[in-house]
Amino acid sequence: MRIIEGGLDDPRVVALLDIHVTRARGETQRGSAHALDVTELKGADVTFWSAWEGEEVVGVGALRRLTAEHGEIKSMHTAEAARGRGVASALLARIMETARASGMTRISLETGSWPYFLPARAFYARHGFIECGPFGSYRPDPNSVFMTRELGLP
């Protein structure tokens, strides 16, 4: 598997992001979905990666800089056929490595509180994330779970 920075102009990446956004918004109450679309992922404060096996995109993920010391994981998604093969772990490792290298000391995320999002919450917990309160521009929301992790040594 290779992970490259970028890919937002590739229709295969856009198709996988469309699946991610559609599912995330479909499983969340109106007003509580925070998935970024392609235009937002192209923002100056966002670094985006795509994971590939051969010519097939198998995962995506992004890091949004909130402050000099704090980043947010966005748009993590693994293609259905590639689940269980370490794609998400590899993307998360790249995101955390980049965050550390840029001086961030904390990385956080927002995911849903509904059963559909349970695998995501379990994944992040396995990687050292703990639940926390809202951060950045988020507000308390019963449909959201906020998680964070200090970026000490890998």
What is the predicted role of each segment?
Residues 1-74, 79, 92-93, 98, ...:
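Acetyl-CoA-dependent GNAT
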Residues 129:
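Glycine-rich phosphate-binding loops of nucleotide-dependent enzymes
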Residues 68-70, 106, 144:
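A generic structural signal for beta-strand entry/edge sites
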Residues 46, 142-146:
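Short hydrophobic/aromatic beta-strand or adjacent loop that forms the aromatic wall/cage
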Residues 80, 109-120, 138-142:
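Conserved beta-strand-loop-alpha-helix junction that forms the acyl-donor binding cleft
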Residues 78, 84-97, 122-126:
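Conserved acetyl-CoA-binding loop-helix of GNAT-fold acetyltransferases
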Residues 99-112:
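Conserved GNAT acetyl-CoA-binding A-motif
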